[in-house]
């Protein structure tokens, strides 16, 4: 699991960064929270985007599981890669169970600790040692984000609702769940994809998603 914080609030820039990562990791799907401000990011992803930094034009995307969302923007050549998530109490419970099962069954591989990551960086990139602090932090950021994810998950509280038996996850006061939410949404989509592909007797290949 690779993660990075998104500090940019302008939707078009966020969409371009998503498509950069999608291209970098040769991903096949993008799992997107389309509630509230997320729908604006979807609208940007659904259009042709030009990346000035990389001098690349990105093809438009469209939604694969929500016809209403798909109909918001229709452009020729759209690629059906966006899996929309609009969480409800019931869906959140399914996502929590799926995430728990994946962790228990060691089906998710996180990046190594920051200390191990720094050791690997020193071994693989000699220039890292003499680089300035900002450059070193750039290389270390994914490992630091992994540590933050683990801390988020440790701080979560699981409760089972008496009447519905649904699982509700709550963060402790002052805590965040952004990283957990992102990873758990992606994991839930993978579980659906896996179930669908396993039902196909023709077999399948592993794919990469961008969340």
What residue spans do the PLM features occupy?
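Mg2+-dependent endonuclease catalytic cores in nucleic-acid-processing enzymes, primarily RNase H-like
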Residues: 1-160
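Amphipathic alpha-helical interaction segments
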Residues: 69, 133-137, 166, 188, ...
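Acidic two-metal-ion nuclease catalytic site recognized across multiple nuclease folds
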Residues: 159, 176-211
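Short, solvent-exposed helix-loop connector elements
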Residues: 162-173
């Amino acid at each position: 699991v690779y993660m990075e914080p998104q500090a940019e609030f302008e939707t078009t820039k966020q969409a371009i960064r998503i498509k950069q990562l999608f291209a970098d990791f040769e991903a096949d799907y993008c799992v997107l929270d389309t509630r509230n401000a997320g729908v604006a990011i979807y609208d940007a992803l659904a259009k042709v985007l030009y990346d000035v930094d990389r001098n690349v034009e990105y093809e438009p995307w469209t939604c694969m599981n929500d016809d209403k969302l798909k109909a918001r923007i229709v452009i020729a050549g759209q690629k059906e890669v966006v899996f929309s998530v609009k969480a409800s109490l019931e869906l959140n419970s399914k996502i929590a169970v799926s995430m728990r099962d994946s962790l228990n069954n060691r089906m998710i591989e996180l990046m190594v600790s920051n200390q191990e990551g720094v050791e690997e960086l020193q071994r693989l990139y000699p220039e890292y040692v003499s680089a300035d602090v900002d450059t070193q932090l750039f290389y270390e950021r994914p490992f630091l984000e992994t540590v933050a994810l683990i801390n988020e998950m440790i701080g979560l509280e699981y409760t089972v609702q008496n009447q519905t038996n649904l699982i509700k996850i709550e963060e402790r006061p002052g805590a965040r769940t952004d990283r957990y939410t992102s990873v758990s949404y992606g994991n839930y989509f993978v579980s659906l994809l896996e179930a669908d592909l396993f039902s196909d007797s023709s077999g399948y290949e592993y794919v990469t998603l961008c969340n």
